[in-house]
């Protein structure tokens, strides 16, 4: 393998190892949680990872890109743009199920019961974090759509706004009086 190809597999391999470690720890019984703990932890990890890479990729594009006279990204910045474009879909795909999983986890009911008995709206209304996941999913969708529609350098600056909002929405939700 050439060094760039090996480097391209480093990040997904690291993610896979971390996901397996988190799953093994939570499934070991050392963590006193519910059955929803593993999917919620993996959803948090996947969405956080994808969101951080999207935000970092946008910053990388804005700092290092050398656009041509028409404002089109150079080849190296375009590679970063492709990473942002693809991981925004992963971010969105992780955030959407997290809305239901977080609402169910906060209500301490299984997701299937909450969805089948019509408690989804009440679950979202009672869970601040589930509403934050709606914000994350919306931000990820905006980035996924907009990054797909343009390869001009100027459009990457406004994309920082939903990226920052999406990355910080879940961590800043709640208050100091709430538990971990």
Annotate each predicted stretch with a short phrase.
Residues 1-180:
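Polytopic transmembrane helical bundles with strong interfacial aromatic enrichment
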């Amino acid at each position: 393998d050439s060094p760039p190809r090996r480097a391209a597999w480093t990040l997904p391999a690291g993610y896979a190892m971390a996901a397996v470690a988190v799953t093994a720890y939570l499934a070991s019984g050392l963590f006193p949680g519910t059955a929803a703990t593993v999917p919620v932890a993996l959803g948090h990890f996947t969405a956080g990872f994808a969101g951080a890479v999207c935000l970092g990729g946008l910053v990388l594009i804005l700092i290092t890109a050398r656009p041509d006279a028409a404002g089109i990204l150079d080849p190296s910045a375009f590679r970063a743009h492709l990473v942002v474009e693809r991981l925004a879909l992963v971010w969105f795909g992780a955030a959407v199920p997290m809305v239901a999983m977080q609402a169910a986890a906060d209500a301490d009911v299984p997701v299937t019961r909450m969805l089948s008995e019509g408690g989804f709206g009440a679950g979202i209304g009672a869970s601040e974090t589930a509403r934050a996941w709606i914000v994350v999913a919306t931000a990820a969708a905006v980035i996924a759509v907009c990054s797909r529609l343009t390869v001009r350098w100027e459009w990457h600056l406004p994309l920082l706004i939903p990226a920052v909002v999406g990355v910080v929405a879940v961590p800043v939700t709640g208050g100091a009086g709430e538990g971990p």
